[in-house]
Amino acid sequence: MESIGLYIHIPFCRQKCLYCDFPSWAGREGQMQMYVDALTAEIRAQGKRYENREVISVFFGGGTPTALEIPMLAQLMQAIWESFRVMADAELTTEANPGTLSYEMAAALKQMGFNRLSMGVQAWQNEKLKQLGRIHTIEDFLENYRAVRQAGFENVNVDLMFALPGQSMAEWQETVRQIAALEPEHISAYSLIIEEGTPFYESYRAGKLELVSEEMDREMYHWTVDTLAEWGYGQYEISNFAKAGRQSRHNRIYWQAEEYLGMGLGAHSYMDGKRFHNSYDLQKYISAKGDTSLFREDTELITETDALAEFMFLGLRLTEGVSFARFRQRFGKEMDAVYGKELQELTELGLLLRDESGVRLSRRGIDVSNAVFERFLL
């Protein structure tokens, strides 16, 4: 029986962060229950469609899932348990941003079946959090983190961001050290990207954002990799670090080009050799009441050429790289027969490392990873 991951999108926030370009809104509390009812209907419909698939991972993202009321989250989780074949050892994660968490919420999430929480902290300094448009202070986070542990969560991820406007190396080092000292099981560290259509983008266009240099961005990144290793966090993907045995199963589904089903507003899926996503129109989604034919958009049949390229550039995000055996098993071909020229050139440039089991990015290759990935687009 083939396994899949589920992604559930919750498009509501208390306040939208200034750098965020995800489909989400603040101040729509009046539409939450209608949305949850529509999403419940989609979950039940898709459960019938994919009743023969085992679910090894469920991930609630957003937005801020914990902006919903406890009964709404319970309604969604109940629909998943009743509609899908969720494995006993499945990883069940929800994003839970500081400022929307409490012991009561954390305990309720545990009761619903969640066994992993992902907390978006981003920075340790309150002035930086305010600059990002975050609703929490670092004191709020610490209180929430203690509540999460008290509620029994033994698998917690903390999201951090570096290369923030005006951020010094000392500020970033303080952030990483303070978070590592709390010993979450998993840490994600992303470089800030200024996305078009966000308030940050408008400030950038107006020359009001003091961005760090490319050199400082890389210096921060390399320091993070080395420092987290000293704290016992193994880097397993370009931006992700975990204690032994705590890698995110849901993340690995994406990077190993395995199948996942997205449900909710704007959610993306990769199923049955096709990519598709749901509408980004909230009213359209709610009105459809779970009828996917009314809100599914941009269905794309993945050609073998596409599948080969995606397998390589997604897999190379993992520090273990792409194994020759997995490539052969997936496509019935040798990697060298398809990408021999590219592999040789990238290896000679010192951007790829090759051994008898497969290929992976070198440290320098990680720094120019997008340029490396482009080489696999045939």
Question: Can you say where each PLM-predicted feature lies in the sequence?
Answer:
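C-terminal scaffold of the Radical SAM
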Residues: M1-I4, S24-K48, R53-K333
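Short active-site neighborhood of thiol/selenol oxidoreductases, capturing the structured segment around
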Residues: L6-H9
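Local cysteine-cluster metal-coordination motifs and their immediate loop/turn environment
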Residues: P11-F22
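Short amphipathic alpha-helical interaction segments
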Residues: K333-E345
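A short, conserved structural fragment
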Residues: T347-S357
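Minor-groove-contacting beta-hairpin "wing" of winged helix-turn-helix DNA-binding domains
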Residues: G358-S362
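Short, amphipathic alpha-helical interaction segments positioned at domain boundaries
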Residues: I366-L378
